Amino acid sequence: MSIIKNFFIGLILVSTLFAGQDLESAKIRLKDKEWDKAEEFLLKALNHPKDKWEAAFHLADKIYPRSQDWDKVKQYMDIASTASANTKIRPTANDRKILMSQAIAASLTKSYNLLYYRATGFLSLLNRVSDVDKRDALVDQAIDTSLQAKELDPLQPGSYAMLGLYYSIKGDKDNAFKYIDQALALPDVPQDVQLALLVSAGQSAV
């Protein structure tokens, strides 16, 4: 029994000894823009209870948006969001400490906007393409991008509006109306956005 007990005590001591070191090493790599090394140390830091929330935030905020791995962005931001309400973090080395919840909200907005504006960009591409197969492929890409934005921040009406629009272009009126209805059901949707959604619904019905 004493051998097993000493083994677990040893594991705890080793874990305590290295707690913080992986996170600090990751921050140095982030500052130097050594993204692969930073990812490696951040993933290690996830194993330290005191560091896991900050490590998860940096993975979701700085590492996986670069590779456009939006599933991992959401996965690690969900982990970061389990931090206690009074947890504070410096989003970057030059920032003052703010609540983790504020840092998460700002980061998600940044990633959402990137996806949303990419989704809207497909409209100009569609206007320049006449080939049916190419248009269909672009519409599918636009829908996928809009869905990624919606999954990342389900409370933003813009991604639902884009889904309604692109499904309407695709000729799928059921899905077009579904996403417009979902957007209108979101809390605190501004009146001008509601009006735009209703206009879009009218166009989809034609």
Residue ranges of predicted features:
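Sec-dependent N-terminal signal peptides
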Residues: 4-15
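Amphipathic alpha-helical repeat scaffolds of TPR domains
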Residues: 20-21, 27, 51-65, 90-129, ...
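Alpha-helical solenoid repeat scaffolds, predominantly canonical TPR units
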Residues: 29, 41, 75-79, 83, ...
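Residue-level detector of the short coil/turn that links helix A to helix B
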Residues: 33, 67-68, 137, 171
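N-terminal, post-signal-peptide region of Sec/Tat-exported proteins
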Residues: 36-76
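Single-residue signature of alpha-solenoid repeat helices
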Residues: 38, 72-73, 135, 142, ...
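Conserved structural position within tetratricopeptide repeats
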Residues: 43-47, 81-82, 89, 144-151, ...
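TPR/TPR-like (Sel1-like) alpha-helical repeat modules
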Residues: 61-89, 181-186
